[in-house]
A protein has these predicted regions:
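Extracellular glycan-interaction patches encoded by glycine-rich segments
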Residues: 30-60
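A general structural signal for short secondary-structure junctions and capping/turn motifs
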Residues: 36-37, 53-57, 89-97, 104, ...
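Extended recognition patches within non-cytosolic domains
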Residues: 16-27, 59-126, 130-146
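Extracellular beta-rich ligand/substrate-recognition surface
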Residues: 19, 51, 167-168
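Short carbohydrate-recognition loop motifs
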Residues: 158-168
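Glycine-centered positions in the ABC transporter ATPase nucleotide-binding domain
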Residues: 11-12
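Localized edge beta-strand/strand-to-loop motifs within extracellular or lumenal beta-rich domains
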Residues: 1-6, 68
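Extracellular structured ligand-interaction cores
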Residues: 2-4, 43, 55-62, 98-100
Length: 168
């Protein structure tokens, strides 16, 4: 059945793009799985494979994981009326669940997960993430909710017509 796991990226359901088929009913997934043996715990990884050192090279903003509920994309974002581009909004989530989290990546400090690091969970659950392979200089303040045009004063030979807050 195709309704047991939903994955959305920018309001697009990418669940059908997943390989390996759909999970059986009541299957225990690696994501969000807990073990009673502390030496065999599964860890949530964002941008890294579960085994080895396969890391992604990407920009990421507003990562939400809701445990136990299936919510619509409209709980997390909306389409901009002017540009037609999907943009994040404050999450409309009544309960994140025990293992749920919301990462806004507001802080630039790296290392062990805490409320003042890049992996701070702002859902209220305090499920902070430890960063690995990330430097303070990798953090950028140019995000979908904080975007500003930057002009290059050294490139005086170009002509431009600026509009929409100099973002176009």
């Amino acid at each position: 059945d195709t309704n047991r796991l939903k994955v959305y990226i920018n309001n697009t359901d990418v669940s059908a793009d997943m390989t390996g088929g759909w999970p059986a009913e009541d299957v225990i997934h690696q994501l969000n799985q807990e073990f009673s043996d502390s030496s065999n715990q599964n860890t949530h990884n964002i941008g890294k494979g579960t085994r080895g050192s396969n890391y992604s090279d990407m920009y990421i903003a507003d990562f939400a994981f809701v445990d136990g509920l299936q919510l619509a994309p409209s709980n997390f974002g909306e389409t901009d009326e002017d540009s037609g581009i999907w943009k994040p909004k404050a999450p409309d989530v009544s309960a994140w669940g025990d293992n749920g989290f919301f990462l806004e990546f507001k802080n630039s400090a790296v290392g062990t997960g805490a409320s003042d690091t890049i992996g701070a969970d702002t859902s209220g659950n305090d499920n902070h993430f430890t960063s690995s392979g990330v430097a303070v200089t990798d953090h950028t303040t140019d995000t979908p909710t904080n975007s500003f045009a930057t002009m290059n004063p050294l490139d005086a030979g170009a002509e431009a017509t600026l509009s929409e807050g100099n973002l176009k």
